Amino acid sequence: AEKKLPQILSGKEVELLLAQPKASDMKGCRDKAMLEVLYATGIRVSELINLNMDDVNLPGGFIRCEGSGKVRIIPVYPEAQQMLRDYMEDVRPKMIANPAEQSLFVNVSGERMSRQGFWKIIKSYQEKAQIDKDITPHTLRHSFAAHLLENGADLRSIQEMLGHSDISSTQVYAQLVKQNLKAVYNKYHPK
């Protein structure tokens, strides 16, 4: 059966989406950190909301992620590290209800963020950014993979970062990139 290709955002659309949360308020700072981490690492939403404080290594510039029985160590680019630092040091301590709370990302009640909670957040920023695409919680994951491929990363490395046990799951992104190239070619070739 032909796998349906996921929708991805262009680099510009990702920038637009990431620019929506206002880092100056607590919720905005948390939301920006969540979106930056998703795009920086390509982790699944379930993995994002399951992150604990000790999964983040800011000095090393990576996060430790456990998904489908495997542990992955994934690099985080500097801007996302900074957003994480701001959230972890300035905002999270004011949001948690219980000082022993281990969850990295918490909701307004100070408890672990839920999938539904995150879903509402990403949809609201999509509307603000006026991105007319069918965004799902996995859209940033798909965009992460496609943008790495477009910029020359190899499929094996992407497979490892995404935590795919089977390379065929990762090959979908190669198809996506080919499709995008074809669209660009058709649009811009002078003949």
At which residue positions do the language-model features occur?
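Conserved catalytic core of the tyrosine transesterase superfamily
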Residues: A1-K191
